[in-house]
Regions:
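The feature captures the beta-strand-to-loop junction immediately N-terminal to the Walker
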Residues: 41-43
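Helix-to-loop junction immediately C-terminal to a conserved catalytic motif
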Residues: 56
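Conserved ABC transporter NBD signature motif
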Residues: 64-72
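Conserved ABC ATPase "signature" region
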Residues: 71-72, 113, 120-137
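Short coil-to-helix segment of the ABC ATPase nucleotide-binding domain corresponding to the Q-loop/switch region
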Residues: 102-111
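Conserved ABC ATPase signature
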Residues: 142-152
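A short, proline-enriched helix->beta-strand linker immediately N-terminal to the Walker B motif
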Residues: 161-165
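Catalytic Walker B motif of ABC-type/P-loop ATPase nucleotide-binding domains
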Residues: 167-170
């Protein structure tokens, strides 16, 4: 029997406000196999975002078991959980979450920097991803120079940088116009066809209809889990996104990571000269 990629058993997540406890998730049991395309749908406050955060190792469950490819996450410390998140997951957010002072290339490279992948391989991988997503002419553009659809394609490339075995897409078309939203969904369908596990988190039935399995969440509980018949779109051979990065050893030591962080910080300072000057004056003058 094939081992599930993601397996949640009896997952509960509670939050405390003052002397009151709020249950965001209640005894969730869910299995997602490798290569599935799943939509988690629910209204605002349904618990779908909390479920996504636990699936993506962005949060801990209060109770229950969560296994990723058989590995129990319950007792992992923050560092171990971050490494698991880095190795398995790529994230696509509604508001893109790109660093405004960095180019498209540098934004895409960020996950690989934290993974310790050498610069030449990072650069080649980022260029390849952006080119396949139609952004080869925008490598040096900052987010403010890109349209919403282009920014979301940069975030997709970033999600794939370390392989993105599981793509977690939180309202991926929510901030886009109709045409850009369709293009983003077409890319996600292609990634699914290439073997990625794709999990959509949405309130929109039209977005959920792209998945082969739809899970409805309400008041922290799973109301239904059903298969869905859908039509799929394909990218042309020229547009297909490379599914996995080339095999590499993670050779960059902590000194190299410090150098990269320093370079990023320097770019941020140069990009905001006036703010930097005023800050320095405030320090000097007191």
């Amino acid at each position: 029997m094939t081992q599930p990629l993601l397996q949640l058993t009896g997952i509960t997540r509670s939050f405390t406000a003052g002397d009151r406890e709020f249950l965001a998730l209640k005894n969730i049991n869910l299995t997602i196999n490798a290569g599935e395309m799943v939509a988690i749908i629910g209204a605002s406050g349904s618990g779908k975002s909390t479920l996504m955060n636990i699936l993506g190792c962005l949060d801990y469950a209060t109770a229950g078991s969560y296994r990723i490819n058989g590995q129990e996450t319950r007792d992992l410390d923050d560092q171990a959980l971050a490494e698991l998140r880095r190795d398995y997951f790529g994230f696509i957010f509604q508001r893109y979450h790109l660093l405004p002072h960095l180019s498209a290339m540098h934004n895409v490279e960020m996950p690989a920097i934290y993974a310790g992948i050498p610069a030449p391989q990072r650069h080649a991988r980022a260029r390849e991803l952006l080119a396949r997503l139609g952004l080869d002419g925008h490598l040096t553009h900052r987010p403010s120079q890109l349209s919403g659809g282009q920014q979301q394609r940069v975030s997709i490339a970033r999600a794939l940088m370390n392989g993105g075995e599981v793509i977690l897409a939180d309202e991926p078309t929510g901030a886009l116009d109709t045409a850009s939203g369709k293009e983003v969904m077409r890319i996600l369908l292609e990634l699914h066809a290439a073997g990625h596990t794709v999990i959509l988190v949405t309130h929109d039935p039209k977005v959920a209809a792209n998945a082969e399995r739809i899970i409805e969440v309400s008041d922290g509980e799973i109301l239904s889990d059903r298969r869905n018949q859908r039509d799929t779109g394909q990218l042309s051979d020229e547009e297909q996104v490379p599914a996995k990065p080339p095999a590499t050893r993670r050779l960059v030591a902590s000194l190299g990571l410090f150098k990269e962080a320093f370079n990023m910080a320097w770019v941020a300072l140069i990009s905001h000269r006036m703010r930097t000057l005023l800050t320095m004056l405030g320090i000097v003058i007191g």
